[in-house]
Amino acid sequence: LQNTSWIDMLKFKISYGAQGNDNIGNYYAYLDQYTVSNSNNDFALALSYKGNKDITWETSHSFNTGFDFEFFKGRLSGTVEYFSRKTTDMLYNKPMNASAGYASIPMNVGSMTNKGVELDLNGLLIETNDLTWRMNFNLTHFKNTINELDPSLNGEMISGSYIYREGESRYQFYLRKYAGVDENGVAQYYKDITDAEGNVTGQEKTTDAPNATRYATGDILPKVYGGFGTSLNAYGFDFSISFAYQLGGRMYDNGYASLMNSGTDPGQNWHKDILKAWTADNKGSNIPRLSATDQYANYLSDRFLTKSDYLSINSITLGYTLPKSWVRSLNISSLRVYMSADNVALFSKRKGFDPRQSYTTASADVYSPIRAISGGLSLSF
């Protein structure tokens, strides 16, 4: 590579490590634990925790490899990296039937892999005595896969609003599917029709939401996320702007769902979309009617899943550095005037919904970052 003029620097890196985890909420998860009670001078033992003598550590194996590079006399630099983290013997408190006499049992339920690529680029587009223009861009592509589950789980495990299946993401939603409204404006949900052997033979609609079938309805994880920006310095002026983005993935808009109630909760506010609800004069609507007796109108379903794509303007800065000849008489070596704005704007699927949250269902009480505008002076003596 010494004879390759356009390569300034090329560095290969690789790392591997393993880490254990025993965080399952009990220091003695391998032991049955009892409480002793004394009532009317009679002693009794009651099972307070069901242990698992076969439980072991959860172990994560992390592997990273990639390149750092600098090309064309420093005009293009960056990093390309592949990462993989395989977690084996995953810890989980498996819920049990009430007839077992205990609520759950700790166990190692399988293995999971997180892997992806990261790209970070920095470019020097123009550099003269009076003008410098730089750009940067980064992205991360990330995929989660459940490799295997304990044989006792028969290939899948349900936990709340999620379903864990071998070969699929652990962030897969497991919700009822909304089927619009019936002829009276009552919310409907899909339900599988099964034969005597339990095989699915068809599908029907039902207004009894708790008995509707739940389905895998989308992955929370985005396909790609990252940021980009640019900076420009010319004739004493400096300008910079940075963006963040996310593509792919879905989130549950809990705030919107709560504002689309059918009137069962007195004193609760409504979203303006409730004006489009079904009425005798608006039978083409797919929004349930307003009725204090319709408790399943905004039931947990894919109706309130929304794309988590977004583009945000994170910051904008504009400044001007006065010529030295102007400030030299004040015994100042440098004076810069600037204004900046942070959290400028967010563009997403639904107004009022901020997808910049953790990979869980959206909460109704999450506040977006506050927009801030400031200005100032920078002095050097």
Where are these regions (language model features)?
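Conserved small-residue
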Residues: M107, L124-I220, M260
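Surface-exposed, low-complexity loop segments enriched in small/polar and acidic residues
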Residues: N97-G101, I158-I163, L175, A212-T213, ...
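Extracytoplasmic gating/loop element in the C-terminal half of outer-membrane beta-barrel translocons
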Residues: Q246-V337
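Extracellular/periplasmic, surface-exposed regions of secreted and cell-surface proteins
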Residues: L1-E168, Y235, L300, L305-F381
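Short, surface-exposed secondary-structure junctions/capping segments
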Residues: G110-M112, E166-Q172, P266-D273
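Glycine-rich, aromatic-lined ligand/substrate-binding cores of catalytic
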Residues: D219-D253
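A short local loop/turn or secondary-structure capping micro-motif enriched for an aromatic residue
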Residues: T87-T88, E197-N199, G248-R250, P355-Q357
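Short, hydrophobic/aromatic alpha-helical segments in well-folded domains
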Residues: G66, P210-T213, Y225-G227
